[in-house]
Amino acid sequence: MADFYQNGIVTTLHNLENRSVEALESELNEFAKKRPLGLILPSLFSELEGKALPATIDHIAKVPYLNEVVIGLDRATKEQYQYALKFFSHLPQQHRVLWNDGPRLQALDEELRKLGLAPKELGKGRNVWYCMGFVLASNRVESVALHDCDILTYDRSLLARLIYPVANPQFNYEFCKGFYARVADGKINGRVSRLLVTPLLRALKHTLGQNDYLEFMDSFRYPLAGEFSFRRDVLNDIRIPSDWGLEIGVLSEMHRNYSHNRLCQSDIADAYDHKHQDLSLNNDQGGLSKMSIDITKALFRKLATQGTVFNTETFRTIKATYFRIALDFIETYHNDAVMNGLKLDIHSEEKAVELFAKNIMKAGTSFLDNPMETPFIPSWNRVVSAKPDVLECLLRAVEEDHKEFLGQ
């Protein structure tokens, strides 16, 4: 059973009673009559052939309260898009697949590129951005959840607990972030959150002093969780990063746009496992190494927008402070693991901390050397201002793809 402690300045909604998914779904069915609910699934084609997504779709097919499911499909040929249409066709809910590599959406992307408004990098951020645009264009839902497609431990209760806070009309939340314990196969996972993000936030607070943004970020129990839910109006104004800083960037945007009492986090799963990234000790352009650099730069950029001045000496101090805090965390997690009968390899943990410490300096150098770097994709409000018919064009492209290849 979870505790009921409220840490930080963001409301935490706990799983206190293991309430049945049927009871949650019964309420969500009633909420959906007045506030239609949707789901965004950003996916790579390769995930359709894995273990996680087929099982996930079987669960989603049984969800009674969804009015729309939007699937963003990346890295797919024409034949693979056709396969995807059949793969998702047994979903009883209204659904559409965005073929991001198809000629129609590529043509729209090129139009936006000429206006300087297209996402500059391929990846999850770009995929999510176009899915958000489609939700705005289709105008079928008032609240929408988003989660990854590689969750090996998925069940319907995860989605129900994720979307409930923005579905309940008696709640005033605009945004909800999921959290869970990353424990699987007898060990504690979640290295980047445990060994980079939390100790780095503590180091920044120690180095820079009291800061509302850092207090806000440190309130989230699992800041890198890929599971969110939003009210529809959030999608108009949000600017999201196109790199690995997506999860941090979304939280930063929520901090910028909304007061703390409109935001919450929800305990959505007792167990959670997904595909794991390599540490990439010798390649800072891949795996957890690149992820750590992108995340760290996202934090530095946000702090700079608030007036924090960075220089090489500052980054050295942050790195040294981080290193000591992170090493202390390893001992804490080791003791937690031992008491719970779990494994935790201290040597591997310290190698990760050493890599992350180096990458804090790399992120700082990159931040200083590239002051004009703008990884954020423009908000849909800005895109509509520049191209007023963009949402209609997006909707038409997706519907024409669907009609051409599925014949419906």
Task: Give each language-model segment a name.
Residues 1-17, 92, 278-408:
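Terminal low-complexity segments of carbohydrate-biosynthetic enzymes
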Residues 17-20, 80-140:
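Active-site-proximal specificity loops/subdomain of glycosyltransferases
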Residues 152-182:
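Conserved donor-nucleotide/metal-binding helix-loop-beta segment in metal-dependent transferases, i.e.
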